[in-house]
A protein has these predicted regions:
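Active-site recognition of the HExxH zinc-binding catalytic motif
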Residues: 58-71
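Metalloprotease/metallohydrolase-associated module, dominated by Zn2+-dependent proteases
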Residues: 1-54, 71-135
Length: 135
């Protein structure tokens, strides 16, 4: 995959990919363990949001960072919502080396046919996650 080569030096193993309707998160990463003990990653992308090319790249790389943390770093629990120290380290590396900004959450995105809602609490949570990397 192009992003694996560009951002992860082709270190990532293949993982499953599903494009599915999800009302909650825009993307999700899960793993399963094979009978041989191998960890298999699965990236889920929501089709309930209109993604342009830049958004898709950001979302895919975000989920690939989860894949990296679990399969390369070998860390199965990385802080609250899996956006801890190992995840943030990869965000900073990618931003510094390639200029790509990966958000922990994307408060500026919204679902199809839904007007964006920017409550004070969502702005505060977005700031704490993205700027301070608290969770």
């Amino acid at each position: 995959m192009e992003y694996n080569k560009l951002y992860f030096n082709n270190e990532l193993s293949m993982c499953r990919f599903t494009y599915i309707y999800m009302r909650g998160p825009f993307g999700r990463y899960t793993t399963s363990i094979t009978p041989k003990g191998e960890r298999i990653g699965h990236i889920w992308i929501s089709r309930s949001i209109d993604l342009n090319e830049d958004m898709l790249e950001e979302l895919m790389v975000h989920e690939m960072i989860h894949h990296y943390v679990q399969t390369i770093d070998g860390v199965s629990f990385d802080g609250l919502f899996q956006h801890g120290r190992h995840f943030v380290r990869q965000i900073k590396r990618i931003k510094k080396r390639y200029g790509l900004v990966i958000w922990v959450c994307c408060p500026h995105w919204h679902f199809r046919n839904e007007k964006p809602k920017y409550s004070l609490s969502s702005k505060v949570i977005g700031y704490l996650r993205n700027n301070l990397h608290l969770f």
